[in-house]
C-alpha cells in the first residue's frame, strides 16, 4: 500500500508581517515544522509550503502541490487569514481539502497568559474559509 502524500499549507495574514510582528512567526513556524514532522513520523510524506498570506502565494502553493501529485491539501490556520485570498484557489483545485484546526496552546484556563490568544485565533479563519468553500460547492473535511 502506498503512503499518503500531503501538501501542508499554513495560512497567515500579511498584515502581521507588514506591522512587524515577527515574534508570532518565531513561534508559529517551529510549530508548523513540529506538525509536519509528526505526519512524517506516521509515514506520511509531507510537501511543505511557505506561509501563505496573499492570493499569489496560495496559487503558487496549490500549483506546486498539483505538480508533485499530492493526495490532498492539509490547511492549517496559523492565524486568521482573509479567505478571499485563498478560498477561490482551494475551491478550484481537484485535490481534496482537509482543514486542520489546531493550536499549540492546549487550554485557556484562568492561569493562561492572555497573550496566547494572538497565537490561537486561526479558528476565525477556519470558519470564514469553510463557509466560502461550502458556498463554492467544494467538499472538505475538518480534523481537530
Each predicted region: which residue ranges?
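Metallocofactor- and cofactor-centric catalytic cores in central/energy metabolism, strongly enriched
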Residues: 1-144
Amino acid at each position: 500500500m502506498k503512503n499518503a502524500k500531503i501538501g501542508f499549507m499554513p495560512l497567515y495574514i500579511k498584515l502581521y508581517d507588514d506591522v512587524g510582528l515577527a515574534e508570532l512567526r518565531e513561534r508559529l513556524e517551529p510549530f508548523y515544522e513540529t506538525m509536519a514532522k509528526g505526519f512524517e513520523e506516521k509515514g506520511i510524506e509531507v510537501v511543505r509550503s511557505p506561509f501563505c498570506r496573499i492570493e499569489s502565494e496560495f496559487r503558487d502553493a496549490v500549483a506546486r502541490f498539483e505538480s508533485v501529485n499530492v493526495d490532498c491539501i492539509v490547511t492549517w490556520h496559523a492565524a486568521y487569514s482573509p479567505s478571499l485570498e485563498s478560498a477561490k484557489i482551494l475551491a478550484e483545485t481537484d485535490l481534496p481539502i482537509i482543514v486542520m484546526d489546531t493550536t499549540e496552546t492546549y487550554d485557556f484556563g484562568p492561569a493562561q497568559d492572555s497573550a496566547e490568544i494572538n497565537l490561537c485565533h486561526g479558528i476565525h479563519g477556519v470558519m470564514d474559509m469553510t463557509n466560502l468553500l461550502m458556498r463554492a460547492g467544494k467538499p472538505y473535511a475538518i480534523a481537530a
